[in-house]
């Protein structure tokens, strides 16, 4: 199946989103609308992939290039409409070389448009010998969509936009999805004669189908799953589609052996991976490339972003980002793990602990009320409550190293850079500024002063 070109339409503002950014840069299940559609289109390996931009053109172009450096960016001029967008794209593509064969055109506001549906559309188009083929679907409520008007034999006559449709046309439930395949020669002829004779004063790409009938057969292929071609025009639709899709994602994981107690409050993005017999408790958000091992327990009320949680680990009421939680390690409740933490096995970070860029050894515990940053903690070390690694000197982040088998007292302060050996014990309230050798007890002498008869200022 050779695809000469694919054109992604991303020029619109999306005014109903009421947003300061283009609609195509809003996210759905962890990816922008634009990137999701580009994913699906690119899977068909078109000879050329083009993205048409206009509103906040540079911003959208940058997002497209970050996905594919080789993408062709087409700037639509101030003449409105999808038909004009395709005119601009074809003019630029034909300048670069001959376009000969099927051309796929897709809107970029359908976040669930999948490569399988597109593949079947192109196959149907080619097998039917069509000059043009439109991807359609049947909706119980077709409000807002262009209607597919057929003749008595079922051939596609035209597509009528909602604002231009009469009463009988509005009753039609088969709708246009804004995805098409044209033969390049048919498309070139069809878009050449487009006019703006409509309520919006735009160049509609849908009008090209009527012209295409004179140059070749026009057909329609119905998407097997209406959800894959459902568009998003406002935030209400975005929320509804997100909820429906997330329910499907949760059901898929449950059928694969994962316990999800409340799918309504559990959100799982596409690139997440979960092992068998893991349990996801209510209020959990699993994002990015998070990986959860077998028998792990996540939640309730936990956010994992690009995190790895090994088998048997527990992460409760916590936020974890780009960190690795070792097997049978316990995190939480109310733990904040910033980027770059690496936990060994059977370790612990407890209540109101914050960590970043720290290695935590096997069996090591930081139970509560501590900040540990830019540090390395050895195996089987216990960190007392209220311990702080003072890692920032105002210019640089400095490293703290605490060895194996250490017992750190409550309320300790480690002034980095500092290194503490193995089997060291520190007294409560110690301030450790200098290196401590192995097998040492260290404490700070802080003299206590009692001022008798003291009264606070407001009582004097």
Curated annotation (Swiss-Prot):
It comes from the Bacteria. Mg(2+) binds at residues 109, 233. GO terms for biological process: cell morphogenesis; cell wall organization; lipid A biosynthetic process; peptidoglycan biosynthetic process; regulation of cell shape; UDP-N-acetylglucosamine biosynthetic process. One of its GO terms (molecular function) is magnesium ion binding. It is an enzyme of class 2 (transferase). Binds 1 Mg(2+) ion per subunit. One of its GO terms (cellular component) is cytoplasm. Residues 257-460 are annotated as: N-acetyltransferase. Keywords: Acyltransferase, Cell shape, Cell wall biogenesis/degradation, Cytoplasm, Magnesium, Metal-binding, Multifunctional enzyme, Nucleotidyltransferase, Peptidoglycan synthesis, Repeat, Transferase. InterPro entries: Bifunctional_GlmU, GlmU-like, GlmU_C_LbH, Hexapep, MobA-like_NTP_Trfase, Nucleotide-diphossugar_trans, Trimer_LpxA-like_sf. This is Bifunctional protein GlmU. It comes from Bifidobacterium longum subsp. infantis (strain ATCC 15697 / DSM 20088 / JCM 1222 / NCTC 11817 / S12). The gene is glmU.
């Amino acid at each position: 199946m050779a695809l000469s070109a694919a054109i992604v339409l991303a020029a619109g503002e999306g005014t109903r989103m009421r947003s300061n950014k283009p609609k195509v840069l809003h996210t759905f299940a962890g990816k922008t609308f634009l990137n999701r559609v580009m994913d699906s289109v690119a899977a068909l390996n078109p000879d050329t992939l083009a993205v048409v931009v206009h509103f906040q053109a540079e911003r959208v172009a940058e997002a497209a290039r970050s996905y594919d450096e080789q993408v062709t960016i087409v700037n639509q001029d101030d003449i409105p409409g999808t038909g004009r967008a395709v005119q601009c794209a074809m003019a630029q593509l034909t300048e670069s070389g001959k376009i000969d064969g099927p051309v796929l055109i897709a809107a970029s506001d359908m976040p669930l448009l999948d490569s399988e549906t597109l593949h079947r559309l192109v196959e149907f188009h080619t097998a039917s010998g069509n000059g043009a083929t439109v991807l359609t679907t049947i909706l119980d409520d077709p409000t807002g969509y262009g209607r597919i008007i057929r003749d008595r034999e079922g051939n596609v006559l035209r597509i009528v936009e909602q604002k231009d449709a009469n009463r009988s046309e509005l009753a039609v439930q088969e709708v246009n999805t804004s995805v098409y395949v044209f033969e390049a020669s048919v498309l070139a002829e069809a878009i050449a004669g487009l006019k703006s004779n409509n309520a919006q004063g735009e160049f509609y790409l849908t009008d090209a189908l009527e012209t295409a009938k004179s140059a070749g057969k026009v057909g329609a292929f119905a998407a097997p799953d209406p959800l894959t071609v459902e568009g998003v025009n406002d935030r209400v639709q975005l929320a509804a589609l997100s909820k429906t899709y997330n329910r499907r994602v949760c059901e898929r994981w449950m059928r694969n052996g994962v316990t999800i107690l409340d799918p309504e409050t559990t959100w799982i993005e596409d690139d997440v991976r979960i092992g068998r017999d893991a349990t996801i408790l209510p209020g959990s958000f699993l994002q990015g490339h998070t990986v959860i091992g077998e028998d792990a327990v996540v939640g309730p009320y936990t956010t994992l972003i690009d995190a790895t949680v090994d088998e048997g680990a527990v992460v409760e009421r916590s936020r974890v980002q780009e960190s690795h939680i070792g097997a049978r390690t316990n995190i939480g409740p109310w733990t904040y793990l910033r980027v770059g933490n690496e936990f060994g096995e059977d370790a612990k970070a407890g209540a109101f602990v914050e960590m970043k860029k720290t290695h935590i050894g096997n069996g090591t515990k930081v139970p509560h009320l501590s900040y540990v940053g830019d540090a390395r903690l050895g195996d089987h070390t216990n960190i007392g409550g209220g311990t702080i690694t003072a890692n920032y000197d105002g210019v640089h982040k400095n490293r703290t190293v605490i060895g194996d088998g250490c017992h750190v007292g409550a309320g300790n302060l480690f002034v980095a850079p500092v290194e503490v050996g193995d089997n060291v014990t520190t007294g409560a309230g110690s301030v450790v500024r200098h290196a401590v050798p192995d097998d040492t007890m260290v404490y700070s002498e802080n003299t206590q002063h009692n001022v008798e008869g003291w009264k606070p200022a407001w009582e004097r």
